[in-house]
A protein has these predicted regions:
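STAS-like cytosolic regulatory interaction modules
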Residues: 1-53, 70-160
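Histidine-anchored nucleotide/phosphate-binding helix
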Residues: 65-69
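Residues immediately C-terminal
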Residues: 56
Length: 160
C-alpha cells in the first residue's frame, strides 16, 4: 500500500477531493483544516470526494469525511457525493451509514481536472487527539452500530 495523500481541485466553488493510497490519522489535521476553509468559502457550491484510488482509510479520516456532510447540511442544505470503485471501501462506507448522508456512486464519475496535493500540517498531540475525538463523535451520530463500535474509544480519549 502506498502512503496516503489528499489531492484537491476547485473551480467556481465546486471542489474535488481525491484520497490516494492509505489515508490515515497522519493526514487528519491537513484534511480538517482544508475542510473548514472550503466550507467557509462564500462561493462554495459542492464537493465530490473521490475514493477510487484509496487503498485504505481509517476511522478518523472517515469521521472527517462524515463531518463534510454534517457541515454541508447545516450551512448549505446540500448533500455531498462520494465516488468509490473499491468494493472494500464501498462496503465500509455502507456499513457506517454513509449512504444516508452522502450520494454514493460506485463507478468512476469524477471530473478529470488538474489536482494539487494538500501540504501535510503538523500539530500538537493534544490538537490531533481532539480532532480524532471529534471525528469519532461524528461517526457515532450516523447510526447505532457506529455508536457501539466507537463508544469505548471516545470514552478513552475523553479521559486522557
Amino acid at each position: 500500500m502506498q502512503s496516503g495523500k489528499i489531492l484537491f481541485a476547485e473551480q467556481d466553488g465546486n471542489y474535488v477531493l481525491k484520497f490516494v493510497g492509505d489515508v490515515r490519522l497522519t493526514l487528519c489535521s491537513t484534511l480538517d483544516h482544508f475542510l473548514e476553509t472550503m466550507l467557509d468559502n462564500q462561493g462554495f457550491k459542492a464537493v465530490i470526494i473521490d475514493l477510487t484510488e484509496t487503498d485504505g482509510i481509517d476511522s478518523t479520516s472517515l469521521g472527517l469525511i462524515a463531518k463534510i456532510s454534517v457541515k454541508m447540511k447545516q450551512r448549505h442544505q446540500l448533500r455531498p457525493t462520494i465516488v468509490s470503485t473499491n468494493e472494500d471501501i464501498s462496503r465500509i462506507l455502507l456499513s457506517m451509514g454513509f449512504d444516508k448522508v452522502f450520494f454514493l456512486i460506485q463507478e468512476r464519475a469524477t471530473p478529470q481536472v488538474p489536482l494539487s496535493e494538500l501540504s501535510p500540517m503538523q500539530e500538537s498531540e493534544q490538537s490531533v487527539r481532539q480532532r480524532v475525538l471529534d471525528a469519532h463523535r461524528v461517526l457515532m451520530e450516523l447510526n447505532d452500530s457506529n455508536r457501539d463500535s466507537f463508544r469505548d474509544l471516545v470514552r478513552s480519549l475523553e479521559c486522557d
